[in-house]
Curated annotation (Swiss-Prot):
Its cofactor is Mg(2+). One of its GO terms (biological process) is L-valine biosynthetic process. Transmembrane segments: none annotated. It catalyses: (2R)-2,3-dihydroxy-3-methylbutanoate + NADP(+) = (2S)-2-acetolactate + NADPH + H(+); (2R,3R)-2,3-dihydroxy-3-methylpentanoate + NADP(+) = (S)-2-ethyl-2-hydroxy-3-oxobutanoate + NADPH + H(+). Mg(2+) 1 binds at D217, E221. Coiled coil: none annotated. Belongs to the ketol-acid reductoisomerase family. Pathway: Amino-acid biosynthesis; L-isoleucine biosynthesis; L-isoleucine from 2-oxobutanoate: step 2/4; Amino-acid biosynthesis; L-valine biosynthesis; L-valine from pyruvate: step 2/4. It comes from the Bacteria. Keywords: Amino-acid biosynthesis, Branched-chain amino acid biosynthesis, Magnesium, Metal-binding, NADP, Oxidoreductase, Repeat. Residues 209-344, 345-484 form the KARI C-terminal knotted domain. This is Ketol-acid reductoisomerase (NADP(+)).
Amino acid sequence: MANYFNTLNLRQQLAQLGKCRFMGRDEFADGASYLQGKKVVIVGCGAQGLNQGLNMRDSGLDISYALRKEAIAEKRASWRKATENGFKVGTYEELIPQADLVVNLTPDKQHSDVVRSVQPLMKDGAALGYSHGFNIVEVGEQIRKDITVVMVAPKCPGTEVREEYKRGFGVPTLIAVHPENDPKGEGMAIAKAWAAATGGHRAGVLESSFVAEVKSDLMGEQTILCGMLQAGSLLCFDKLVAEGTDPAYAEKLIQFGWETITEALKQGGITLMMDRLSNPAKLRAYALSEQLKEIMAPLFQKHMDDIISGEFSSGMMADWANDDKKLLTWREETGKTAFETAPQFEGKIGEQEYFDKGVLMIAMVKAGVELAFETMVDSGIIEESAYYESLHELPLIANTIARKRLYEMNVVISDTAEYGNYLFSYACVPLLKPFMAELQPGDLGSAIPEGAVDNAQLRDVNDAIRSHAIEQVGKKLRGYMKDMKRIAVAG
């Protein structure tokens, strides 16, 4: 099969990359009613599959799970999760023929096999749903022309999708209709109802395209969301230990530092994160971030180029065909790094200490977020999409590192994200080693002393931070989420 994106002409490619519209609340006035009374069958019961299903059932929809015969016979984890939560479970042959909407929430590498199994069983005029468009865009899966193909992509892990719903809210969500598969013109109605059923309409929904979702998602997860955090963790730990820091303290400063730093990012963007620093430290973090951006820009651009061209996907799919040899080797090597095997620190590190002693880490976050955003926008992706795939998701990924270091991050993210993470981090670590060798006291592991600063310089730095495009669009989107949360709680 041909990569779908590469079959489009340039005008079509740019149009799909640039498709992004923030949808109004009034567009979801009907909630999930379009799907009520219809049969929704979810294939796969992982984190997204289970939690989306729970939300959709609580929204009044008829939800069941189609699993492989062997998963049912052997009572695998997917079968246990579905049955323990009171869902009807059956084989593909038992459930798919009656389904009005089949939602494929299996891992990317299983999509082709799943779609080839369920397509012949789907009734005429049914709909097929995805939460990530890799199978359509990168694999180029051909879907029967009578089938409507839609996407609802929550911009959070499945557990977060459920927790926010239970609080009466939701998570930001992208929705799309595949232009090659909307025979009855009902794709948008299906996608809107599905998004409303998961609670996404309460946090903000972007009408996007399969292409824009895939290309921006791949770029974000490879660079700032996973690759930069992994490279930064390994580099910072080794630097601290080489300069005499207790390995246990160094490990904790990094493991929990990312989460603490990005919590400020979540609440107030790069501006608030930088405002947590003293004035001298802020100036230094800004200078370091500018150096990092200059060094890393070609690497970010290479990843974006390889994503756009399909080079990344073809390489990863070749590894799938080779039993994940590269992926499993990189995973094993990561598990043996000094950071992953360091002892745990039993003492306490105060919240402000993470900022004061993590100036370099803050610079890495700032540089990575801005570079990912800028590179996506330069490639034709709209700012709102670029924001959600860079700054917005970073605190969620940082939280996984706080749980069980890089191991947990790589377990939680998809195999696609993990593969891209390793590609980036394996290139980034040697790239930044000369930069790490030139660091000054106070950049990492110790605080920069208070001292006089040049007012004009501080003014210019503050202006530069606040005027960046990601801060402008981020302020708007975070404000919308706060407004929606207040409305949801009041309701």
